[in-house]
Amino acid sequence: IRIAGNVTNPSSTQELLIYGGVDIVKVGIGGGSACSTRFVTGCGIPQFSACLENSYVAHGLQSGIKKLGLVCSDGGHKNAGDVAKALCAGADFVMLGGYFAGTEECDGEWEYEYRSIIKKDIDNYKETFDWWQPIDPGYDTDKRKNSFTYYGMSTHIAQNNYEKNIKNYRASEGTRIVVKYKGELKQVIQELLGGIRSCCCYIGSDSIKNMPRCAELCVVNTLHNNKNPTLGV
């Protein structure tokens, strides 16, 4: 299976599928949670629009009864709802990175918090103070993961770690982000799958494949997109 990208222009998707012999086209530029490409280069379009336009072109190309190519939505999926929207926009796959940052299985830069216990005996009254703090108390105690730091692959940090040197002609197109500990990966995946199942239920779709056919799209403002006006949160 050959995967190529990233693109946002439908004509590029056509070229990759017809002339490049690609099976899957990755769609999306500048939408990643740790990405600053749109600010640094001025390039990129909204992820939902990119999926909608490129999947329409990719799925329209056929060799007999077989689809010539598929689309993978890459970047900008901050929650299960974003993944569901990408699938409704025609994405066959969704690529997630920062979504899983902070899970138990992550290997990288972790910050820990330490348990501190102080017992006091005042006038025959014993009291125990038990709390967690980010500072190591200096003695043997319990510790747990508190936060995780990750960065985009186009940052100077990644270039230095994986390419061994930083190209002087390249700009950093990403940043470092610190996220709180999220628990085990399976819990995050269960929440994600549950969100997709609920979306299918709401729109009346019996499968992921039929989500684009069942979904009805509308334009909303920032308030409705980022908050819940009913609950005021």
Language-model features: locations:
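Glycine-rich tight-turn/loop motif centered on a GG-T
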Residues: 1, 30-49
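Catalytic cores of alpha/beta
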Residues: 8-27, 77-92
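Short gly/pro/ser/thr-enriched loop/turn and capping motifs at secondary-structure boundaries
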Residues: 10-11, 31-36, 100-105, 111
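Alpha/beta catalytic cores of nucleotide-metabolism and tRNA/nucleoside-modifying enzymes
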Residues: 42-73, 78-233
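Metal-dependent enolase-superfamily TIM-barrel catalytic cores that perform enediolate-based chemistry
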Residues: 1-8
